[in-house]
Every structure is written in structure tokens, then in C-alpha cells.
Amino acid sequence: SVTDSSAAGTALATGAKTYNGAIGMDDNKSVLQSVAERAKKSGKKVGVTTSVSVDHATPAAFYAHQPDRGMYYEIALDLPKAGFDFYAGGGFLKPTTTADKKEAPSIFPIFEEAGYTVARGLDEYKSKSAQADKMILIQKEGAEPSCLPYAIDRQEGDLTLAEITESAISFLTKGSNKGFFLMVEG
């Protein structure tokens, strides 16, 4: 069978082959440590950024450990467990619905309780980032969470991957000289 992006993302992030659908797990559903997790353990700041949703297969493979890529809510719950410093993308696909289609508490207060500052749009990021220890940057309220708009469809104030990347580098280099790891998917 042809490799899907969750298996490919897991291979990129961990160096291990796995089954289609797996996020950060091997064929036996055991957790695989990603290069991003190793960087964090070594004292580096870590960021995961994407032009799609933050809980999508490739970015998730760097911070999450779930047996199925469709477990968007559960993948999002793995984000604060990883404890990385910066996450950014279009948004989150299922912020209040579990994989078994049950209503659940919104992920955003969970992120905030874990010490993350959530910024919706670049202007909000600029006003909040200086005081933030950990940051999540997503599209403005009401924007499509699945991906950033293509250039031809972009409106004033829409995030771009270039803005996300610049913001990530700026955030990850403030107050630290231990280096950083940044995954950018576009």
C-alpha cells in the first residue's frame, strides 16, 4: 500500500516506519520519540508550524502519539503534554468533539491552563507574544481552521506561512541561547 502522510510524518519525525494512520506510534502502537521531543529534552526550544491545521498528520507526528490520525481532539490534547514552546497553523479541526463523536471540553481553556497563550491572527500575536512563555498562533476567529488560504484567496489579515515562520523564529530565539528546533510544513 502507499504510505499516507501520518506514516510519512511519523517516519520523518522519529526515523521509524509505521502503519498508515499512526501518529508517533510504531506497528505495535508503542510510543515513538520524535526528533522534536529529543530537542526539547536536550534543553532547546521547540516549535511546530504548518499551513494546515495544527492537529493534522504531519505536524502532529512531531508532538502527538495516537493510533489513528482521525483522532483530532485527542491529538490536540497531546499538544500541552509535549510542552513545546510554539505551535502555529490554520487552527484545530475538532476542538470540542472526540474521535467517537462525543462532545468534550474545548481544547482552548486546556491549552491556557497548561500555560499557553493562544493568539488568533498576527496582530494578536504581536500584542501577546512578549509576555508569553508558550504560544499557539492560529487564524483569526471565524477563519477556516483546516488550512491557511492560498495566495489567490488571501484576504487582508489572513496568516501566511512566511509570517508564521518569522513569528516562530522570533519567539524561539527570545531569551535563550541554547538553540531551537523548528518544523515548518507548507
Regions found by a protein language model. Give the residues of each.
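Anion-binding catalytic surfaces of enzymes that hydrolyze or transfer phosphate/sulfate esters
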Residues: 123-186
